[in-house]
Amino acid sequence: MNLFCVGLSHHTANVETRERFAGGAGARSILRQAGCAEALVLATCNRVEVYGASEKRVSTDQIAHCLLQNNEVSDRGHSEALPFYRYEAEKCVQHLFRVASGLDSMVVGETEILGQAKKAYQSARTSGAVGPCLHRLFNGLFVLPNRSARIQKSPAVLCRSARSRSTWLKKFSASSGIAAFWF
């Protein structure tokens, strides 16, 4: 399974460009149009990202086309000029964790993004667009804030949490067919 993220953010596109894509691209339509086995759309005021998993590689242009088509914007000649970024496999996982923790936000440390990721996950899950790969990835993401709160209370928890996270990463890598990664 190929895990990937394709998106636009405040780092790569101005507000007007981001708004063209934020209007409601649904994960189900991306599944149908681009051939993804799983898809989730995370749209915030500063980013629009598609997290997906597929048997064969889905191109960045295919995702851009789906986003443009779903937002009823003419896509002739636009996808080549748009500043999309793409992360695959472990880079995708690292990017998601940076985004959700607020490290990739316009205001570093922003906490709202994790809630937006949870809503995007619930929406995609309800529509049937989340499968086992994205389910494990996002559920692994959602346990981190609870662990962080416990770490602040006791230094011993830090060691257990690091060991637990290391074990989770190894299991996720092995079961997803993704090479081991660390961040």
How would you name each of these model-derived features?
Residues M1-S105:
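A glycine-rich (often HGG/GG-containing) alpha/beta subdomain
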Residues S79-I178:
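Glycine/serine-rich phosphate-binding loop and adjoining beta1-alpha1 elements at the start
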Residues A179-F183:
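Conserved class I S-adenosyl-L-methionine
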